[in-house]
Amino acid sequence: MKRRLFLKGAGLGAAAGIASPAIAQSTPTVTWRLASSYPKSLETLYGACTHLSEAVSAVTDGKFKIQVFAAGEIVPALQVADAVTNGTVEMGHSGSYFYIGKDTAFAFGTVIPWGPNSRQMQAWLFHAGGLELLNEVYAKFHI
């Protein structure tokens, strides 16, 4: 009895293993566009997006690609949030301080000017509910 159960389980496992490559190959490639507020010449800021894009592509075997566009290539630098809100692009890389005219609460997403230092900001975001509060603000704009 145990032998039959073992053989049945082994057979199902082998069938699943044989089918796995076919399932993996049928996964469609997804491409998202990321608009940045920063020019290519600002390697620290713009370069972070290209590194993210390369890392995501690598860990997904090229099945999820992020095309990075510098300021002005799709939308002007200060309209990245609008582009995400309107669905023009799937992702945006910008500073929330650019959008305090839309909602002054965007100021809490940045440390400029005279805000907390990087450790204080990380503590507020990840240990004091800051990220949840910012997500509520961003959600109003479909970001």
Model-found features: residue ranges?
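N-terminal export signals
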Residues: 5-25
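Immediate post-signal peptide segment of exported/extracytoplasmic ligand-binding proteins
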Residues: 19-37, 58-64, 139
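Extracytoplasmic "Venus flytrap"
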Residues: 33-50, 71-75
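Short, polar/charged alpha-helical segment
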Residues: 42-67, 128
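Stable alpha-helical elements in mature extracytoplasmic
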Residues: 48, 52, 76, 80, ...
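Contiguous mixed-secondary-structure segments that line small-molecule binding/active-site clefts
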Residues: 53-54, 95-143
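Alpha-to-beta junction loops
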Residues: 62-64, 80-94
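Extracytoplasmic small-molecule ligand-binding "clamshell" domains
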Residues: 66-84, 107
